[in-house]
């Protein structure tokens, strides 16, 4: 069973989604199925079929969440320190071409959200950053071509 690294915040988010799906969404869907079933003929009952599909999707996600939570390797980034980049680090970079600063936190695959500044540990930029420190230069082969960055800051917590 492969462990799935994630931050404490990511782990708590998955647990909250699981709780919501089991305790709120599941009963709502069961009620919708019962209501649609009461309308009679199920063969042409669009509400019934939509509710059954929603149930299938919800149960699939519940199974996925249970698996992720069981395999979670929770890393409390508030207890990490150091001046090199590793899982959980928040890194400030400067693009060598545009001189634009970017800030990213390196997180697990399930909690990555580039718009929020959280990048997956398995992303090209995170892989290039692991083990680097302030002042180091990295080159990332991205879909738009190679980009160069300099590490300005490495923070934890």
UniProtKB/Swiss-Prot annotation:
Q: Which GO terms describe its biological process?
A: DNA-templated transcription elongation; regulation of DNA-templated transcription elongation
Swiss-Prot/TrEMBL keywords: DNA-binding, Transcription, Transcription regulation
Q: Which domain of life is it from?
A: Bacteria
Q: Which GO terms describe its molecular function?
A: DNA binding; RNA polymerase binding
* Record-linked Gene3D superfamilies: Transcription elongation factor, GreA/GreB, C-terminal domain (3.10.50.30), Transcription elongation factor, GreA/GreB, N-terminal domain (1.10.287.180)
Q: Which InterPro entries match?
A: GreA/GreB_C_sf, TF_GreA/GreB_CS, Tscrpt_elong_fac_GreA, Tscrpt_elong_fac_GreA/B, Tscrpt_elong_fac_GreA/B_C, Tscrpt_elong_fac_GreA/B_fam, Tscrpt_elong_fac_GreA/B_N, Tscrpt_elong_fac_GreA/B_N_sf
Q: Which Pfam families match?
A: GreA_GreB, GreA_GreB_N
**Record bears the keyword Transferase:** no
Job description of the protein = Necessary for efficient RNA polymerase transcription elongation past template-encoded arresting sites. The arresting sites in DNA have the property of trapping a certain fraction of elongating RNA polymerases that pass through, resulting in locked ternary complexes. Cleavage of the nascent transcript by cleavage factors such as GreA or GreB allows the resumption of elongation from the new 3'terminus. GreA releases sequences of 2 to 3 nucleotides.
HAMAP family per UniProt = GreA_GreB
Q: Which family does it belong to?
A: Belongs to the GreA/GreB family.
Q: What is this protein called?
A: Transcription elongation factor GreA
Q: Which organism is it from?
A: Chelativorans sp. (strain BNC1)
Name of the coding gene = greA
């Amino acid at each position: 069973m492969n462990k799935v690294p994630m931050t404490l915040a990511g782990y708590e988010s998955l647990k909250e989604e699981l709780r919501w799906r089991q305790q709120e969404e599941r009963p709502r869907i069961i009620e919708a199925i019962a209501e649609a079933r009461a309308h009679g003929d199920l063969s042409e009952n669009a509400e019934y079929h939509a509710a059954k599909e929603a149930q299938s999707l919800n149960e699939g996600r519940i199974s996925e969440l249970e698996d992720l939570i069981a395999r979670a390797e929770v890393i409390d980034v508030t207890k990490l320190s150091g001046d090199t980049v590793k899982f959980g680090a928040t890194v400030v970079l400067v693009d060598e071409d545009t001189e634009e600063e970017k800030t990213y936190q390196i997180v697990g695959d399930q909690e990555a959200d580039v718009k929020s500044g959280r990048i997956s540990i398995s992303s090209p930029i995170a892989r290039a950053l692991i083990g680097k420190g302030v002042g180091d230069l990295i080159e990332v082969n991205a879909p738009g071509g190679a980009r160069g960055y300099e590490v300005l800051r490495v923070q934890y917590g």
